[in-house]
Amino acid sequence: VGAGAQGPAEVFDVLVGEGGENNPLPMIGVAQLYRRDVPDLLAGPDDSDLLQVFWCPFDAHGENRTGMLLDLRWRRSWEVVEVLAQPPVPERVGSEGYVPEPCVLHPEQVVTYPFAGLLPEELCARIEAREEALEEEAEEAEVEEWDWPTYQFDLSIPPGWRAGGYASWNLTDADVLECPACAAAPMELLLTIDSKEWDGGSGSWMPLEERDPAVAADAEPTGVQVGRWGKLNVFACPADPGHPHLKSIQ
């Protein structure tokens, strides 16, 4: 993940100069994932095994001239023979949050479960009853707040950048997205780009090797900011990965 060896985000001018939003600009590289390294990454079209993610550094260039413009490119890794030592970068960006810090991935597989709002009502009621009982036990034992596990924060969907799994719908109502091209089956989560790797409510997902206070304070290693410190979920069609993707910011 990251923009390559381009140095820290501070080298980019976040002020829009005269005509900056109208002149052609190179898109920013956000992530590069190989299926051999990320087992849960959904398959690409036509035997593609390399997913490259780019976005435009200006909100105004998204759909209907608003929001984010995302570009996903599937490639066959064995066909990539010429690699740019110095990828092109824009002279200006609309927001510093569009410029990732260079990062090396260390994928780790975890078990995830659907967002609570998509579960059957009876199961949701059982989960709520269990959490209420745990809360009462914690209060009687004078345990500090959030020291008991909850489905939303500890057991279902982890924070941070992810490939595959289930999407969080913490900002909007839970939804099942259908492919705009075929509507053959519910779309599946391809990738989550998160502003933070953890927060105060999801500390149980923090890697053990990063729980030292000096390290734990840095929950934003990529420097990416999606919306108001939210996350971007990108969905793919399970019937045909070549169909258009959908996205949701939470």
Regions found by a protein language model. Give the residues of each.
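Preference for intrinsically disordered or flexible, low-complexity segments
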Residues: 1-250
